[in-house]
Every structure is written in structure tokens, then in C-alpha cells.
Amino acid sequence: MALRTLRRARLNSLIERLDLFPLTSKFEKQEPLFLFARGLIFSSALIEEIRQDLPRRFSVCWGQIMTEDGMLSPEADIIIYEGSPYHEWKTEVMRFTLVPKDQVTVSIECCEYFRPTKHHKSHLNDLLRFTPKVFLFAECCWSKHKYQCKRARQSFLDMGFDDVFFLYKSYYGIDKEKEANDADWFRFLDAIRSL
């Protein structure tokens, strides 16, 4: 019971941190650069959370996966791997890593909206050439209804993602209340712990 309470508190804290840079609905205007920065904020916050549950033999980073002959994957939001990276660029505010393909356990793609697109499918296909598993973690399912989130989840799974998660449910209308998705959060942390 205490673990569930702690995990729920971490989920609520993560949602609060992301609220400093709120998502907008598809009906509101948003600058493209802001969307890119928003994605980095989400994936870096998720990396911080993963580190708390990740078994010690693993590392987690943002970067690209590299084969022995020098082929590079597309950029991966989150890579979980064992061993040492090929190279890592570290500054006070950023860390970008090149990870050997044979050391990768899972790659996690982050997105703001729980809405499948052709881009998700093509990016997934490109990543699967470099990683054994790919999870998708979306910030928000814009829906009042569980069945719409369930349908979106199934679409992502049908594309080939190994598992799919989202943080909260919200709706475009006047009531912008967020409904935290405890079930996915607990499942995600369990998946990380069981690597």
C-alpha cells in the first residue's frame, strides 16, 4: 500500500511539473519550437522518474543507437541499456549519448498526445532496426471516454509498439481537469523494475 501511495505521489508531482508548460488542445495555436521544447521537457522528466526504479545494471539516456559498422538510429527520446556508451556529450543542462546496439534493452518514444499518426509508424519501423523493444509513452489522452483511449492504445499496439502508456486523461472543453492514469503509471514502473 505504501509503494502505491508513493508511486501515486510521484505521478501527481510529474503532472504538476509538466503543468508549468501546459499542453494545448488541437484547437489552440502553439508555436512549433514550443512543441519541440515541450517534448524535451516531458522526456527528460520521464528519464528522472525512470532512474528511481531502474535496476542498477542499466543506464538511461536520450540519444541515438549505433551499430558496429557506424549506422545510426533516428533520435530516441529514451534509451535503456547495459554497459558503456560509445560516446556521451555532457553539459550542465544536456546529455546526449551514442549507445551500442547490442547493449540496448528498450527504447521509449514520448509524445504529447495519445493519438496514432503515420509518423509514429514510420519512426517505430526505423527504430526497430536498432532496438529489440519500443514502448510509447504519451502525456495526455484527450478524451472523456475510456473506449477512445482504449482504441488509441490498440492502434499503437497494432503498429508494433511493445507497450503503450499515457500519464493522464483530459478533455478539450471548459473542464480542463486532468484525470491521472494510475494504472498505466504503475504498470510502467513495474515494467522498468522488471528489466
Task: Briefly describe each language-model feature range.
Residues M1-A76, I80-L195:
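Intrinsically disordered, low-complexity Ser/Thr/Pro/Gly-rich regulatory segments
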